[in-house]
């Protein structure tokens, strides 16, 4: 079996069906719940400065690259970058139990994603280039290793001055503890959340964030110290996911950088600090996850093998929906637990937030995720004033419109809805009340039918895996997760609330849109509307004097 065929087999085996769910333990073993906070015991610890001063730009300015002037790289701006991407945003408390919320959403609030900083000398941080692990509970950095300025120059050769790197990894066990074999999907979905969170956080500082596509997973792991097996428990290893180049300047084109292999080898040969903390006392081993993870390891690839966005692709001018700052919207993001079934949004609001999802080389976060766009939206519209309820489709790449039309139900209307901007490829497929259908295909969850709308993210599936390789399976989830992160923030800006839905019946979703065969697959669901708040919960600040006593995230 080819690696891409293994990825497809995994996807098929981990589908939820009306007749039964993907394989998991079947219950929650609370005694082995993973610690959501990785620490490297013995590593030098550097708290990052925090400030209540909000100097971020208006939220509406962060989606275009030319609207925010770059801020200098310093200890304060490094802190702000993490504070608006991977940090804790609040704590919740109920009957003495406390759990953390973060700026980057996570399936089940289990947070498999870890972050790393690779940076040159910075006043107040270090006189030498270093690699750090980000500790969100303390909003601090843990020094993993340092290296010479000569090696640093080799590593960043080709990047503008003061550039830095951010690395991301996944601890699959955190998701597998609850979700079993389907956990690999959720780790990749959360990686998409995190990539978009980093891109958007960088945009608040005027920094451009680029995914370094050519790098292999092996090289990313070596650079971040993730291949040092003696420093991790064997069931709690971190899978390398991505290395981001963060550029604090208005460079016109993304870098075509592949960090020097010789520099990475020299860094790996240095002295590394810290031992990864144990997250659980025991583990359940899922061989299917091991198999798909091995198949989807990314090799080194050609710089331009993913192509480019279509010429002219870009977001239309969207009127500001809020006067709030970017920092306020990012840090108030929450996942809805229930929706009221009555709140509607206007047609123009609907068009504006969908416009944020259109890819383009100058649009955040799509400049980070990069081409090609392979994920489209199948929408269940319930309560949008000025639009008929029914099924709609958003085609996010023009070359996919004809294949999607041919793949979906022949009787669909494919009509342009009234007042829809010409730049937004949105189509009415069929009219009618679809609240029950939306809830039914989303694992019978009422929240999918109680919002203004819900959606399934439908990816072109077989051809990209055949063309690029099994590793592109992960990229489909990254793109879907990034869409989710933008929708989360757009809901907050519109004064409503949203949530991602990872539990859905895969093939019934395809049936709802008339999709037959494996060419298109649903990757992630989402809903937004008027929230029903749980008055039993107390909200506590993210960081304060009693933070060391706070608990861990429940599922």
Regions found by a protein language model. Give the residues of each.
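N-terminal accessory segments that position/regulate proteins before the catalytic core
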Residues: 1-486, 494-555
């Amino acid at each position: 079996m080819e690696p891409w065929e293994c990825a497809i087999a995994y996807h098929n085996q981990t589908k939820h069906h009306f007749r039964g769910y993907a394989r998991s333990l079947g219950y929650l073993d609370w005694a082995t719940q993973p610690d959501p906070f990785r620490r490297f015991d013995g590593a030098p610890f550097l708290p990052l400065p925090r400030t209540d001063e909000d100097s971020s730009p208006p939220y509406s300015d962060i989606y275009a690259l030319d609207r925010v002037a770059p801020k200098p790289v310093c200890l304060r701006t490094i802190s702000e970058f993490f504070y608006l991407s991977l940090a804790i945003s609040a704590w919740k408390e109920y009957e003495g139990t406390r759990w953390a919320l973060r700026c980057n959403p996570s399936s089940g609030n289990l947070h498999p994603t870890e972050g790393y900083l690779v940076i040159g000398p910075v006043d107040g941080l270090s006189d030498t280039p270093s690699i750090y692990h980000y500790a969100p509970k303390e909003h601090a950095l843990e020094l993993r290793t340092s290296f010479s300025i000569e090696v640093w120059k080799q590593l960043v050769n080709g990047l503008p001055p003061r550039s830095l790197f951010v690395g991301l990894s996944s601890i699959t066990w955190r998701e597998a503890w609850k979700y079993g074999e389907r956990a690999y999907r959720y780790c990749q979905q959360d990686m998409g959340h995190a990539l978009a969170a980093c891109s958007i956080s960088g945009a608040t500082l005027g920094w451009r964030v680029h995914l370094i596509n050519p790098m292999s997973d092996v090289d990313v792991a070596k650079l971040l110290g993730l291949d040092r097996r003696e420093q991790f428990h064997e069931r709690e290893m971190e899978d390398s996911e991505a290395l981001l180049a963060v550029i604090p300047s208005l460079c016109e084109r993304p870098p075509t950088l592949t960090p020097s292999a010789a520099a990475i080898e020299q860094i790996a040969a240095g002295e590394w600090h810290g031992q990864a903390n144990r997250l659980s006392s025991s583990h359940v081993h899922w061989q299917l996850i091991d198999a798909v993870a091995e198949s989807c390891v990314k090799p080194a690839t050609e710089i331009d093998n993913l192509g480019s966005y279509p010429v002219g692709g870009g977001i239309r001018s969207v009127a500001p929906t809020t006067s709030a700052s970017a920092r306020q919207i990012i840090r108030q993001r929450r996942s809805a637990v229930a929706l009221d079934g009555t709140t509607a949004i206007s047609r123009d609001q609907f068009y504006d937030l969908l416009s944020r999802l259109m890819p383009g080389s100058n649009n955040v976060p799509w400049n980070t995720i990069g081409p090609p766009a392979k994920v489209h939206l199948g929408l269940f519209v319930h309560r949008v004033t000025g639009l008929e309820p029914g099924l709609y489709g958003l085609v996010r790449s023009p070359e996919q419109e004809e294949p999607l039309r041919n793949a979906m139900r022949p009787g669909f209307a494919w009509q342009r809805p009234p007042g829809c901007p010409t730049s937004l490829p949105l189509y009415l497929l069929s009219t009618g009340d679809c609240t029950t259908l939306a809830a039914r295909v989303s694992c019978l969850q009422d929240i999918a039918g109680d919002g203004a709308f819900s959606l399934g993210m439908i990816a072109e599936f077989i051809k990209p895996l055949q063309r690029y390789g099994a590793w592109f399976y992960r990229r489909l989830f990254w793109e879907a997760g990034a869409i989710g992160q933008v929708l989360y923030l757009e809901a907050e800006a519109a004064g409503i609330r949203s949530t991602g839905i990872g539990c859905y019946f895969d093939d019934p979703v395809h049936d709802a849109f008339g999709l037959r065969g494996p060419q298109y697959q649903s990757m992630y669901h989402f809903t937004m509307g008027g929230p029903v708040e749980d008055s039993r919960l107390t909200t506590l600040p993210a960081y304060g004097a009693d933070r060391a006593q706070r608990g861990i995230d429940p599922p």
